Amino acid sequence: MKILISVCGEGFGHTTRCVAIGEALKNDYEISYIAYGKSKNFIEKYGFKVFETFPEIKLKGKDGKFDITSSILNKEYSPKKAIRREINIIREYNPDLIISDCKYSTVVAAKLLKKPVICISNQNYTRYKLKTDLIVYPTMKALNIINERCERFIVPDFPLPYTICEYNLKIIKNMEFIGPLIRYDVDDVDNYGEDYILSVIGGFEYRYKILEELGKIALKNNLNVKLVCGSYEVAKKLMRDLNLNSYKNENVEIIPITTNMKELIKNAELIVSHGGHSTIMEALSFGKPLIVIPDLDHPEQGNNAKKVHDLGCGIALSYKELYRLEEAILDIRNMKMYKRNASKMKELAKKYDGKKNIKKIIDEFFETRKNIRKYYLTDRIANKLINKFKLKIR
């Protein structure tokens, strides 16, 4: 059976969890991807075939502020262009099933070609301020119409009430929680190094001030930090602004790009994140407490940060409150409840293994279709025999 996985390339979280899906399924199914940009390059490193497409939107922001209006209403990228391209890809590859991670142009293309499709997302609802209600809420309503027409709507998160993306969800009839869908296998060994603070804020330059502030705090307090920048341009600027002579220093390590995120997370004491869902899933699956600093005007990240705070496994800070970052670091290091609660989430992640559960769902999907085909085939043969028998009696 052939499965085509389509990836939204805005942010890296969609890409990493789609790689996890491919790795979970590749031994029993033929797997290919639809992707673009850095996501396409990343997936190809795992040896999968990737069809190139176009983005539907492009995330935009400045000085820590996410601009949702400019991201949705942009002249640069058009969903129509992506749909046309993806219709051609689906016709060429002819998959038995399509899995779409927030790439709704692919869902539309699949429905037009009458192909079964499973949606994966950590958001189908939001609470946002009034000035963009006329854009955000109609968009979400339209997407939920699409979501409900998919075979399944899969949420790669812990079940309620431990769901990190709970405040970004509206329960729909075909929704199913499968647990964290991360690339890595989490080892049972607990005696990790845990001797540094890891900043993982993604590759968007408008989050730069978080990196800079954390670097200054580390130099001031002699804290060990590792700062993942997402690009060499950001890394070079950070090195200059912190007056450092190299990427690797006594207690501050600047990492432009990494291919070793598992070891970085596994051996960290705590994680500083921007609130992306996949990063939080990875941190909690390893039992790491978090400091979450969502982009301004980014409701999804803000809601994730609030849930981390409500579960007591981390601290949520506003981008406008970076002056509190030093205090937050000390609180997490000194107050044992954060580590204790994060460790409980790690145990929960072992119980709800997203990769095993997605494999089970796909296996059941194909088994059900096989049984339905067998039933209809048997039914048709039986009808033919009955009709033939009736003719003989006459």
UniProtKB/Swiss-Prot annotation:
Q: Which organism is it from?
A: Methanocaldococcus jannaschii (strain ATCC 43067 / DSM 2661 / JAL-1 / JCM 10045 / NBRC 100440)
Alphabetically list the UniProt keywords: Glycosyltransferase, Transferase
Q: What is the name attached to this protein's record?
A: Uncharacterized glycosyltransferase MJ1255
- Coiled coil, from the record: none
- Disulfide bond residue pairs: none
Gene Ontology molecular function: any one: glycosyltransferase activity
Q: Which SUPFAM superfamilies match?
A: UDP-Glycosyltransferase/glycogen phosphorylase
The record's similarity note reads: Belongs to the glycosyltransferase 28 family.
Assigned EC number: 2.4.-.-
Q: Record's superkingdom?
A: Archaea
Which CDD domains does this one have? GT28_MurG (cd03785)
InterPro entries reported for this sequence: Glyco_trans_28_C, MJ1255-like
What top-level class of enzyme does the UniProt entry assign? Answer: transferase
